[in-house]
Amino acid sequence: MLGVIAFALVVVISGCAPVPGGEPSGDPTPSIASDTPTPTPEPTKPAVADLLLSPDGLGPLRVGETPPATDPALDILVYDPDYCAEIPEASSPGMWLANYPVEASGHRPFTAAFRNGADTLSVIAIFSPEIRTETGIHLGSTKDELLAAYPEGFASKLDNHGVSTVYSVAGTAGQLLIEVTADGMPGYWPADELNRVNLLTVIPADSNPFGVAGGDAYFWGECTGP
């Protein structure tokens, strides 16, 4: 019995012993705030895949407006005053160019056009599949993907001589034309290109929709264009 009592006392005493390190060791060392300001990130030109296409324009570009010119290293559209200087048929020695390299398709990611000598944008045509609409549509999207992306329908629908169908999405100052290859002329399109988006174009809201496939409207971005 005495052994049991002695054992109990040992347990109680050991349970009441202070835990090593439990006592405060003194005032904590004060932290020293850094006076070095957080560096501001340098502005950069958006990547092609970050340019959002809308019925009114592309990124900072808007149809009906003059392209913003802030910094040639940052602007997505820049003016080259001598780009067409050595081409006799050119309507002007200079041209506005997408500020990105030419891609494997032979085009820059997009092109912009000005009509009738105006200094405001009237056409923005997309040539890169990396550029997408807010709903995810891009060059190469299927017709089914397009119809699912716009369940409420389109402002208009145009049959382009059976070669393609042009769907119009209305904006405020502009409209987005989404051209989809069609099978109205059997054999015109390779099987893997049929029923797919083959051109995305932004034009002013008061312009009439049109089709490009099978026509000669690819003059946009060329020195001999209007």
Where are these regions (language model features)?
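C-terminal motif of bacterial Sec signal peptides marking the signal peptidase cleavage site
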Residues: 12-15
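Short, surface-exposed linear segments at secondary-structure transitions and domain or protein termini
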Residues: 185-195
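Short helix/turn-capping signatures at newly exposed starts of structured segments
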Residues: 17-161, 193-226
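Bacterial N-terminal signal peptides that target proteins for export
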Residues: 1-5
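Short aromatic loop motif centered on NTY/YTY
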Residues: 157-187
